[in-house]
Amino acid sequence: MTEPVTIIGSYLSPYVRKVLVFLHHKKIPYQIDPIVPFFGDERFSKLSPVRRIPVLIDDRVTLCDSSVICQYLEDRHPEPALYPRDIADRASARWLEEFADTRMGDVFIWKLFNQVVINPFVFGEKTDEVILKQALSEDIPGVLDHLESQLPANGFVFGAFSIADIAIAVFFRNAAFAGFRVDAARWPKTAGFVDRVLAQDGF
């Protein structure tokens, strides 16, 4: 591959950021074709039928969905490996990536970040206080309880830095934009993990 890959998306999106961090650690050159979240023209609709970012365009393929993109990049550029080599760990990493993309996306993006940042500042809409209250009192603590049972006290999830670390950590960047920080007294492993991973290059 001689030309940089193109990523259509916004830095605000944790799914875009996941792919950009992945590209950075793979040392794959890329360029951003920026798009405002939730908007897009007819061309974008053709590239992404579900109108979601990121979209990757390279010399072989156009792909949507951050997980599909990262797995494609891993297959095409296997070194340095960002998915564990052990098949059980690799499957577990994919599960954590799926948990992050779905459950954490729902809680940290739709119920927290969108309510605090996107709705008032992009759409000019009021924050739904009922949704936000439930997120802060029930949904987010539930996610953090689960992460606390899965994350290591030191280092990364599977020893070496991997997609699992990236996929989880990107949501805490958006959470910070919304004024949320993990309570280190209640969830010490998660708080330490987030600080370690977000300190890595590319975030």
Where are these regions (language model features)?
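GST-like domain detector, emphasizing the conserved glutathione-binding G-site
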Residues: 1-134
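GST-like fold's C-terminal all-alpha helical module
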Residues: 3, 100-199
